[in-house]
Every structure is written in structure tokens, then in C-alpha cells.
Regions:
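Flexible loop/turn connectors
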Residues: 184-292
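Hydrophobic alpha-helical segments within soluble ligand-binding/sensing domains
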Residues: 114-141, 156, 160, 180-188, ...
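Short, solvent-exposed amphipathic alpha-helices that sit
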Residues: 28-42, 123-127, 149-168, 209, ...
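Short beta-strand elements in bilobed, periplasmic/extracellular small-molecule ligand-binding domains
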Residues: 40-51, 141, 159-183
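N-terminal helix-turn-helix DNA-binding module of bacterial transcription factors
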Residues: 1-15, 291
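An alpha-beta-alpha
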Residues: 125-167, 270, 274-290
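Alpha-helical recognition/docking segments in bacterial nutrient-uptake
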Residues: 12-129, 191-192
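Short acidic capping loops at alpha-helix termini that bridge into adjacent secondary structure
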Residues: 138, 169-173, 221-227
Length: 292
């Protein structure tokens, strides 16, 4: 078996892919890594995973460290702070050096590179539409602050479907949650002050928190309140009641991102500037948290 270190010095190829993700709490990111790892291993690549912890500085440091000869290319999802700052110089520098980058989930249109996403707007539209089809009208949205790209797109999908059904948008029902620490009080406030019959949550954590707080108030799920969440993770499958979710197909997303990156790495000599954005299908998995 050839010695990898010797080979990489000879070819200037490390056969290693750097992954930078914003956090590891969400099951979604774990599934994406798993998909990347599968394809990387099938193609003889190793994977190094770094966390930006939603911090711009940490994202830059991780990138500089990995671009310093220890990886051939990157797969990443942007941190909240990077999206807020709209500062992508670190990505631009790496791309200018000729290192391929694939962005997934939280992307920016300001960066020219390959991307893998779901149609966040359409997925939120379909999930809200599903709730409306069950005769529910007062649908609250638990989302992120607008500078997080996926939160903004999911909010747009929710607004579009209400508009299409002629349901008036009530801003009091749109709860933008900055971070998980304030999640409880914001959701509690919503349940105390608004009469709602459904919730769309942009992640599982918001959904399970809403269910827990609602049940503590004697609100029955799904009789009094239906809940749908993004991400088909472990929480949704095992919470009581189980949660109706939009599956983001993280494994598929990871596999696709790795395939795109490796294709770029192996193309090498042929300058192919046509960047692609691949859209992964989502599907609604109906469980106990919504009216049948």
C-alpha cells in the first residue's frame, strides 16, 4: 500500500476534504457529514470536520488552517455571523487559489461556486399548505432571524402560501428566534398571547420546545394544535407525540456535495467554470403531531 504522506508530497494532493459546519447539535448536519463521508471513502478521500460554532472568526481560522496544505477542497455551510456580515473574503481567497469549494444548505449567491440546497421556500410552502388543507387557519411560524438564508427562504414560503389562500398575515404569529437560549420564552409568549391552531417550525428543536410548552399548558397535540418541523431527525421520530417533518434528505445532500467536489478535484486541468446548484428533493413525513 503506497504511503499517503509520501504520495501527497509528491503530487501535492492530500486526498483529504475539509468540511466546515456551523454546529453539530442539529441532526441535519450529522446526516450531511455522513453522506459526504460515504462518497469520500468510496473515492479514496479522507474527511476533516471543523465547527465554526456560528462564528465568523472561527470559520476564517478553520479555513486558513485547512487551506494550508492539509486539504484539497472544501464543503461548507456558512455560519450565522458570516451571513450577517456578508463578508466572504476567506472563501473568495480559497477559490482564487484554485481550491474548489462546495456550499450546502446555508449558501450565499455572492459566492461563485458549486452549491447543494433544498428548495427551502417550496418546502415551507408545501408544509404550510398541508396545514391549511387540514382546515387550519391560524398558523404560527417559528423561524430564525432573516439574515440566516434558509430561515428567510422558509419564511417567504410561508408568507406566499398564506397570500395564495387569501389568509391575512399576522406579524404577531411570526416568531424570529435569534438563538436557542431565548427559544423557550419566545415560544411561551406566543402560546400565552395568541390563539393559534398550528405551528410550522424551521427546525426540530423549535418544534419539540413548542410541543413541550403547549402540553404543559394543557394544549392537546394535535387536537388543539398541529405542529410541522423541518429536518427529519431523531427527535421527530422519538418525541411524544412523534413529529410531522419535512425531510431535508441530509445524506443525499452530503453525497451530492462530495460528488461535486471530487468531480472538480479530478477534473483539475480542464477549466470548467460552469458552477452548478443542485436542488435536493424534500418530502413531508406525516406523523402524530398533525391532525389526520
Amino acid at each position: 500500500k503506497p504511503n499517503n504522506i509520501a504520495l501527497s508530497l509528491k503530487n501535492k494532493k492530500t486526498k483529504t476534504i475539509g468540511i466546515i459546519i456551523p454546529e453539530i447539535v442539529h441532526h441535519f448536519f450529522a446526516t450531511v457529514i455522513s453522506g459526504i463521508e460515504q462518497v469520500a471513502n468510496e473515492c479514496g478521500y479522507n474527511v476533516i470536520v471543523c465547527l465554526s460554532d456560528e462564528s465568523f472568526d472561527k470559520e476564517v481560522i478553520n479555513m486558513e488552517m485547512l487551506a494550508n496544505g492539509s486539504t484539497d477542497g472544501f464543503i461548507m455551510s456558512l455560519s450565522k455571523e458570516t451571513q450577517q456580515k456578508k463578508d466572504f473574503h476567506h472563501l473568495q481567497e480559497v477559490i482564487n487559489q484554485g481550491m474548489p469549494v462546495v456550499l450546502f444548505d446555508r449558501i450565499s449567491n455572492d459566492i461563485l461556486c458549486d452549491k447543494v440546497i433544498i428548495d427551502d421556500q417550496l418546502a415551507a410552502y408545501e408544509a404550510t399548505n398541508f396545514l391549511i388543507s387540514k382546515g387550519l387557519k391560524k398558523i404560527a411560524l417559528l423561524t430564525t432571524v432573516d439574515y440566516v438564508s434558509v430561515g428567510k427562504l422558509r419564511t417567504d414560503g410561508y408568507l406566499n402560501v398564506l397570500h395564495d389562500h387569501g389568509i391575512e398575515v399576522d406579524e404577531n404569529l411570526i416568531i424570529r428566534i435569534e438563538d436557542t437560549e431565548h427559544c423557550d420564552e419566545k415560544i411561551n409568549e406566543l402560546l400565552e398571547n395568541q390563539s393559534i391552531d398550528a405551528i410550522l417550525a424551521v427546525n426540530e428543536l423549535f418544534a419539540v420546545t413548542a410541543i413541550k410548552l403547549a402540553m404543559a399548558k394543557g394544549i392537546k397535540i394535535p387536537e388543539d394544535l398541529s405542529v410541522v418541523a423541518f429536518t427529519d431527525g431523531i427527535i421527530s421520530k422519538y418525541s411524544t407525540p412523534t413529529i410531522t417533518t419535512i425531510s431535508q434528505n441530509g445524506i443525499k445532500m452530503g453525497r451530492k456535495a462530495a460528488e461535486m467536489l471530487i468531480k472538480r478535484l479530478e477534473l483539475e486541468d480542464e477549466e470548467d467554470e460552469h458552477y452548478k446548484t443542485e436542488i435536493i428533493e424534500t418530502n413531508l413525513i406525516i406523523r402524530e403531531s398533525t391532525k389526520s
